[in-house]
């Protein structure tokens, strides 16, 4: 079995290897056997690593049939290196054909020991990194670039969380980084926002066919479509009338009430809202792949409310508004859809009053979403609120 050169992080005193295989793929696991080394992993622990990797590769390549990654030239298996002291839980290193002296393909490094301390944590990390190598299989070994780069961590984070099925334990902090910045386009992946954008692949998955919806998205990417159009076409397998704009707007409806996410247990923060008791606002920009959430709270003197929305620049055809209504008893929110047919329309809500019954709505969130999938088109809107 030929193995290409190890990454520089894999500096073992005494190297051990294990091979894990199924009918589609084979992985060689590398680890430190020297018990005096800080990176030592016992044979008992490596037995567990074998079981974890076998389960994950069966999950991806047998159960769901994802394409296998590119093997490095001359290799007969894929490589995972367990090494200590990394700056993250793990990483996948891509080798392109132009890399100096290195055959194309990828290798994975997992930070173990000591930073990963639980069984689910190590499983999630391995599943996340293997999914990165799967991404390369659909992108001619280039990964996601340009405007689509956000999907790199968003989809891998979702895939890892989906595998361990513990979104809240490991996804909450990531999700909340995105939920405080929904007005910022996907193209801004600073401050690790893209990890929290796993919520968009999660919404697609829980609505349009599970992990297969992500696999179909990658297949369309491989056919030359950008990510957002690929997500639309994937959704159309389940609903042939699905459009990217409505998918994104319903995603933002979930962000207004994250209890709608599977396994969130209502513990994600709601998307950051602008002033809850705004009377008027003007020229609010809504960029492609972003949304603006406005909150409205009833007072003891209100019984209804009307909100007039005006599109002040850009095209109203790029806008969808969702009014999310939260009942007084804390039950499930409901929403009303507004797809503008002109530059101005008015929303009227009765039962906008304080109280603790299901028949009143003491709190509303108006969500303005941008339906454009080109990463560039924007519009601006203003609103005027009148209490009744």
Could you tell me what each predicted segment is?
Residues 26, 105-107, 344, 363:
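A generic structural signal for beta-strand entry/edge sites
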Residues 50, 57-61, 157, 201-205, ...:
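Non-transmembrane alpha-helical segments in soluble domains
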Residues 223-388:
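Beta/coil-rich, acidic/histidine-enriched accessory regions frequently appended to metallopeptidases
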Residues 31, 82-83, 158, 203, ...:
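Hydrophobic side chains in beta-strands
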């Amino acid at each position: 079995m030929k193995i290409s050169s190890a990454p520089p992080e894999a500096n073992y005193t005494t190297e051990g290897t294990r091979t894990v295989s199924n009918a589609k793929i084979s992985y060689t696991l590398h680890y430190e056997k020297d018990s005096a080394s800080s990176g030592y992993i016992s044979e008992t622990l490596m037995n567990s690593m074998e079981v974890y990797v076998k389960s994950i590769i069966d999950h991806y390549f047998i159960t769901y049939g994802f394409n296998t990654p590119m093997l490095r030239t001359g290799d007969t298996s894929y490589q995972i290196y367990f090494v200590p002291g990394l700056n993250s839980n793990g990483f996948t290193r891509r080798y392109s054909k132009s890399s100096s002296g290195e055959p194309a393909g990828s290798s994975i490094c997992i930070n173990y020991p000591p930073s990963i301390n639980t069984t689910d944590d190590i499983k999630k990390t391995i599943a996340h990194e293997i999914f990165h190598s799967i991404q390369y299989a659909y992108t001619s070994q280039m990964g996601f670039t340009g405007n689509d780069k956000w999907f790199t961590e968003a989809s891998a984070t979702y895939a890892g969380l989906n595998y361990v099925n513990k979104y809240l334990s490991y996804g909450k902090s990531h999700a909340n980084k995105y939920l405080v910045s929904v007005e910022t386009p996907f193209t801004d992946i600073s401050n690790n926002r893209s990890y929290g954008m796993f919520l968009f692949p999660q919404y697609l998955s829980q609505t349009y066919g599970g992990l297969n919806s992500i696999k179909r998205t990658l297949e369309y990417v491989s056919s030359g479509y950008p990510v957002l159009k690929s997500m639309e076409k994937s959704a159309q397998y389940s609903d042939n009338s699905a459009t990217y704009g409505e998918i994104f707007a319903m995603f933002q409806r979930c962000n207004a009430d994250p209890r709608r996410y599977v396994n969130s247990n209502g513990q994600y923060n709601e998307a950051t809202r602008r002033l809850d008791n705004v009377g008027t606002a003007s020229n609010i920009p809504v960029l492609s792949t972003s949304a603006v959430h406005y909150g409205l709270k009833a007072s003891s003197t209100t019984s209804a409310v009307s909100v007039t929305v005006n599109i002040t620049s850009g095209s109203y055809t790029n806008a969808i508004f969702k009014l999310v209504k939260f009942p007084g008893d804390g039950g499930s929110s409901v929403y009303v859809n507004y797809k503008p047919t002109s530059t101005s329309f008015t929303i009227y809500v009765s039962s906008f009053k304080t109280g603790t019954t299901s028949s009143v709505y003491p709190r509303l969130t108006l969500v303005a979403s941008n339906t454009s999938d080109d990463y560039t088109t924007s519009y601006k809107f203003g609103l005027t609120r009148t209490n009744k």
